[in-house]
UniProtKB/Swiss-Prot annotation:
Matches recorded under HAMAP family: 3MGH
Enzyme Commission code: 3.2.2.-
CDD domains: AAG
Domain of life: Bacteria
A Gene Ontology BP annotation from the UniProt entry: base-excision repair
Pfam family, one: Pur_DNA_glyco
Keyword Kinase: no
Similarity annotation: Belongs to the DNA glycosylase MPG family.
Enzyme class: hydrolase
Key words of the record: DNA damage, DNA repair, Hydrolase
Name this protein carries in UniProt: Putative 3-methyladenine DNA glycosylase
Species the sequence originates in: Paraburkholderia phytofirmans (strain DSM 17436 / LMG 22146 / PsJN) (Burkholderia phytofirmans)
GO-annotated molecular function: alkylbase DNA N-glycosylase activity; DNA binding
Length: 213
C-alpha cells in the first residue's frame, strides 16, 4: 500500500450477501477504488438501488441478452451500461450465477485522488463530482471496458471496506423510473451531502427514520 492511502481492504465474494436487496443495503459505507498508473481514486459509496429478480425495470427482466450478460455472472461483477445514449451506469451483479439481478451504484463521496477525479469533471463542486450514477462513472473513469470486470479482484476497479463501527442506512423509493416506483429499494447514508435526488425523499418510509445495517 502506498504511503498515506486509506486502509481499504478488498471485499471478497464470500463477504457479499446473496440477496439483491441485502446487497444494496450492505454496500452503503463500502468503497469504490480505481487504481491507475498515475494514482488511486477512491470514495465511499453513499447511495445504491436494488434491482431484484422479477423487477420489470431491471435490464435482466427479459432474460439473458448479448448486452446484459454481466448481470448473470457471479455476485460482484460490474455491469456497465449506456443509458439514454448519454451516460454509463455502474451496476454490480447479485444473486447466484445465472439468476440475473443487480444493484446500481448511485452516488459516492470522493476521498482519494481528487486531482484525478476533478480532471474528469472540471469546474464541478466537490459535492457534485459523483452525486448521481452518470456523474459517478465520469468521475471515476468507468466505461464499457469494465463491463464484466470482477469488482472483487482487488485490482484496477474494485470494491473494498474499512473496518469501522455500525453504519446507519436509510431506505426510500427509487428515483428516475416510470414504473415500480413505490418499492423501498433505494439505500443511502443519512446526512451525507453526496446523496443524489431531492432531500425530501431521504426518509425511511416505514418509520420516518434511517435504519441501521
Amino acid at each position: 500500500m502506498r504511503k498515506h492511502q486509506l486502509p481499504i481492504l478488498p471485499l471478497l465474494r464470500d463477504d457479499l450477501p446473496l440477496d439483491t436487496v441485502e446487497l444494496a443495503r450492505f454496500m452503503i459505507g463500502k468503497y469504490l477504488v480505481h487504481d491507475l498508473p498515475e494514482g488511486r481514486m477512491s470514495g465511499r459509496i453513499v447511495e445504491t438501488e436494488a434491482y431484484p429478480l422479477g423487477d420489470s425495470t431491471s435490464h435482466a427482466f427479459m432474460g439473458r441478452r448479448p448486452h446484459n450478460g454481466s448481470m448473470f455472472l457471479a455476485p460482484g461483477h460490474a455491469y456497465v451500461r449506456l443509458t439514454y445514449g448519454l451516460s454509463y451506469m455502474l451496476n454490480m451483479s447479485a444473486e447466484a450465477e445465472e439468476v440475473g439481478a443487480g444493484i446500481l451504484l448511485r452516488a459516492i463521496e470522493p476521498l482519494e485522488g481528487l486531482p484525478l477525479i476533478e480532471a474528469r469533471r472540471p469546474g464541478v463542486p466537490l459535492r457534485d463530482l459523483a452525486r448521481g450514477p452518470g456523474r459517478l462513472t465520469m468521475a471515476f473513469g468507468v466505461g464499457p471496458s469494465f463491463d464484466g470486470w470482477d469488482l472483487c479482484s482487488g485490482q484496477g476497479l474494485w470494491i473494498g471496506v474499512i473496518e469501522r463501527g455500525e453504519v446507519p442506512v436509510g431506505v426510500t423509493t427509487r428515483i428516475g423510473l416510470s414504473r415500480e416506483m413505490h418499492q423501498p429499494l433505494r439505500f443511502f447514508e443519512p446526512g451525507s451531502a453526496f446523496v443524489s435526488g431531492p432531500r425530501k425523499l431521504l426518509v425511511t418510509p416505514q418509520s420516518g427514520a434511517p435504519k441501521r445495517a
